[in-house]
Design a protein with these regions (language model features):
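Generic hydrophobic, amphipathic alpha-helix propensity
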Residues: 8-17, 34, 59-63, 67, ...
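Amphipathic alpha-helical packing segments from all-alpha helical-bundle domains
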Residues: 62-68, 72, 115-140, 145-149, ...
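Hydrophobic alpha-helical connector segments
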Residues: 58, 72-98, 151
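C-terminal peripheral helix-coil segments that are non-catalytic and often amphipathic
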Residues: 94, 98, 130-138, 154, ...
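Helix-turn-helix
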Residues: 12, 16, 20-54, 58
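Short coil/turn segments at alpha/beta junctions that flank glycine-rich nucleotide-binding fingerprints
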Residues: 23-27, 78, 99
């Protein structure tokens, strides 16, 4: 049975697994690869998780739960609808700028989970997408569902080109993307 979510060794294992999955891909990665990268024996790894899919599931669950909680908390007391949308974008991008390997794994391995793992992650993703759709609708955005997925498209591929130590810090990146999106979603012109 996996340890509590805040177990330091499990947390370290999940970080290493995200790095290896991001570099090699989930399907090309073996438990031996993860053992070597983590410095943990295979027996030690199996003490934490029954198998590789469980690691992928825990990475995805932890990310979606964390970002969902963080965004909900951040927008809870923001009354201005446009500022709520900006806050959503800011928190989403700041979270994933700090977790680029996890972002890549979430983007590339979305269909690699099976059974109950897949259902639970799909439910978390649905809840997160609905939160963004409601946020966009509150800002008088047109077609909230389409707009939400377009915004996720803008935000979720930053791992392919964004460097946190580059010209824009995570907050500046988030503010830039939020402005681009807000002007488009409200029908503004550039």
């Amino acid at each position: 049975m996996p340890h509590a979510p805040y177990d330091e060794r499990l947390d370290a294992l999940l970080r290493v697994a995200a790095q290896v999955f991001a570099r090699k891909g989930y399907h090309a990665t073996t438990m031996r690869d993860l053992s070597r990268a983590s410095g943990m024996s295979l027996a030690g790894m199996y003490h934490y998780v029954p198998g590789k899919e469980d690691l992928l599931y825990l990475i995805q669950r932890r990310c979606f739960q964390s970002v969902l909680h963080d965004v909900q908390e951040a927008i809870a007391n923001v009354t201005d609808p446009i500022e709520r949308l900006r806050t959503f974008v800011r928190r989403h991008l700041e979270f994933f700028a700090a977790n680029m390997n996890e972002m890549k794994v979430l983007s590339h391995e979305a269909d690699s989970l099976t059974g109950e793992h897949a259902r639970e992650i799909l439910d978390l993703k649905r809840r997160y997408a609905q939160l963004l759709q409601r946020t966009i609708a509150g800002a008088n955005g047109r077609h909230p569902s389409v707009a939400a997925y377009a915004l996720f498209g803008m935000m979720n591929w930053i791992y392919t080109w964004y460097r946190p130590d580059g010209v824009l810090g995570p907050t500046e990146l988030a503010d830039t993307i939020a402005e681009l999106f807000v002007h488009g979603v409200r029908g503004g012109t550039a």
